Amino acid sequence: MATSSSLFHPIEKELYSVEHNLKSVAGTRHPILYAAAKHLFEAGGKRLRPAIVLLVAKSTSEQQEIKPGQRRLAEITEIIHTASLVHDDVIDECSTRRGEKTVHKLFNTKIAVLAGDFLFAQSSWYLANIGNLEVVKVITKVITDFAEGEIRQGLVHFDPSISIDDYIEKSFYKTASLVAASCRGAAMLNDLNSQMHNDLYLYGKHMGLAFQIMDDVLDIAGSTKSLGKPSGADFMNGNLTAPILFALTQEGKLDQLIQREFSDERDISLALFLIKKSGGITKAKDLAKEQVQAALCCLQFLPKSAPVSSLKELTHFIITRLS
């Protein structure tokens, strides 16, 4: 199975540059914000989002070159993603992320909210300096999508009546919108036609959805060590994801546990057992596979190249994260 480092080989130098720049994003004028941002970016992460932006940029360039604006867009994508995680952790009261203390636990809630706000503002500043108004419009829409997704999620906590379609729509707003918009933005900076913009947008959308579905599978099937946070953390907070929704169609007892919000100390372990027993995890993985197949179809117009191969292989990497 390919590793993320081998998949990123065509953009290895550019990704290293992005990583280096992220660690200095807050500057030294704001010591507390700098410390918070440094903590966030040094905690690591998969950096899949900036990598996808760079791969799209190279895949759609005749010379396989990455423009400065595209490199900056890759950084902006990760900054926006990180800002959203800071706010998510406050809302969900998470204590760890990527195996490290969350910002609001390391500092306090006020600093965490301000750090997230600062990163969103910083991303907007960098975005404006790319100098392409259409790209600015595409990317800034993502920030409103994040808020929309968070509101939708908050309104259906511990609600077993939500559908898979509701879940997919919420997942688009919270996760896939950023990947989709960033892919479109990278293509726009290479002056491609609108159909190509749309195909790459859809690639990003389907990849983002597949990634979110597999994240939700891992939340239930993964270990605390591999996740960097307690397993089952999302559904303990009432966030009902694909494996749970599929399990609900087979296990009536699970509905009862959700309705009482896992109030008994044994409810969580019983819920995990029922989800695994019902085949909910397998069905969720099948849903993720449908998304990656749709993503692959969106790349058919691109000529063969190493960056295109990496974009295709990334789909398999996402699906095999549990292997």
Curated annotation (Swiss-Prot):
Q: Which residues bind isopentenyl diphosphate?
A: 46, 49, 81, 98
Top class in the EC scheme: transferase
Gene3D superfamilies assigned to the protein according to its UniProt record, in alphabetical order: Farnesyl Diphosphate Synthase
Name under which the protein is recorded:
Prenyl transferase
The family assignment reads:
Belongs to the FPP/GGPP synthase family.
UniProt binding sites for Mg(2+) 1? 88, 92
Q: Does the keyword Plastid apply?
A: yes
Q: Which residues bind Mg(2+) 2?
A: 88, 92
InterPro entries named in the record: Isoprenoid_synthase_dom_sf, Polyprenyl_synt, Polyprenyl_synt_CS
Q: Which organism is it from?
A: Porphyra purpurea
Q: What gene name is listed for this protein? A: preA
Localisation per UniProt entry: Plastid, Chloroplast
Task: Give the lineage.
Answer: Eukaryota, Rhodophyta, Bangiophyceae, Bangiales, Bangiaceae
- Report the SS bond pairs: none
GO terms assigned for molecular function: metal ion binding; prenyltransferase activity
Alphabetized, the UniProt keywords read: Chloroplast, Isoprene biosynthesis, Magnesium, Metal-binding, Photosynthesis, Plastid, Transferase
EC code: 2.5.1.-
Mind telling me which SUPFAM superfamilies this protein's record contains?
Terpenoid synthases
- Write out the GO biological process terms: isoprenoid biosynthetic process; photosynthesis; quinone biosynthetic process
Which Pfam families would you find in this protein's record? polyprenyl_synt
Cofactor binding note = Binds 2 Mg(2+) ions per subunit.
The record's GO CC annotations read:
chloroplast
